[in-house]
């Protein structure tokens, strides 16, 4: 196979993955929530169809925490660490609250409220062979913090492909760890994020670990998932 055919095949596979991945909806009481964090594949599909540019793309940098918040050149949802990702089903990061809101609207959804997000993450509302129905747990993984992409549990030391992480409460994936997730709850110019990220320990994945961040903020640690009425 020539180098040109390999390039064509690679581009075809990328296009196929952009179109092929569908994020399942899980019914939680009177609303639905996506099983996975919104992926690079999904966000790219939205951006391609709407000619959408994130602020990280416009500014030419994303943020990582070092000696304070440090700019990282060419870090955006397409190249989260400044280079092509290992997988297009990694979470879409470097996305602000407002940009996440626009994506969810595009797919006829919205950001979940913190109350909705918390119910989905900690209370087992569906029949399950693993978790007790109607019980509210401490962690998105159950009574104990385990198998979540947090700095003290898994050795990835970065966000990870959502299809390779285990299911937790209600069959949802990465409600604890991996990346913080925007919710629609607001306070002045800030919005509430939940679930913590891989950079933190698992203790931050509890309900009390939620944090407000500036709504126009974007960084390597922050992504989202959408909720739906039906």
Protein language model regions, located:
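Short, compositionally biased
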Residues: 2-80, 97-98, 123-127, 218-230
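Functional-site microenvironments in short loops/helix caps that host divalent-cation chemistry
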Residues: 53, 64-65, 71-211, 220
């Amino acid at each position: 196979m020539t180098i040109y055919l390999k390039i064509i095949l690679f581009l075809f596979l990328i296009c196929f993955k952009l179109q092929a991945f569908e994020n399942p909806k899980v019914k939680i009481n009177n609303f639905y929530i996506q099983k996975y964090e919104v992926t690079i594949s999904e966000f790219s599909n939205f951006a391609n169809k709407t000619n959408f540019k994130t602020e990280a793309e416009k500014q030419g940098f994303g943020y990582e925490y070092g000696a304070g918040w440090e700019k990282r050149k060419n870090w955006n949802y397409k190249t989260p660490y400044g280079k092509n990702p290992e997988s297009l089903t990694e979470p879409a990061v470097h996305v602000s609250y407002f940009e996440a809101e626009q994506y969810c609207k595009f797919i006829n959804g919205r950001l979940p409220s913190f109350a909705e997000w918390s119910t989905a993450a900690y209370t087992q509302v569906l029949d399950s062979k693993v978790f007790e129905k109607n019980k509210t747990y401490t962690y998105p993984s159950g009574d104990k913090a385990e198998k979540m992409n947090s700095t003290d549990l898994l050795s990835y030391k970065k966000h990870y492909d959502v299809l390779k992480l285990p299911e937790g409460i209600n069959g949802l994936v990465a409600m604890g760890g991996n990346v913080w997730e925007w919710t629609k709850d607001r306070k002045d110019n800030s919005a509430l994020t939940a679930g913590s990220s891989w950079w933190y320990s698992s203790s931050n994945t509890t309900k009390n670990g939620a944090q407000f961040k500036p709504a126009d903020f974007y960084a390597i640690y922050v992504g989202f998932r959408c909720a739906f009425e039906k």
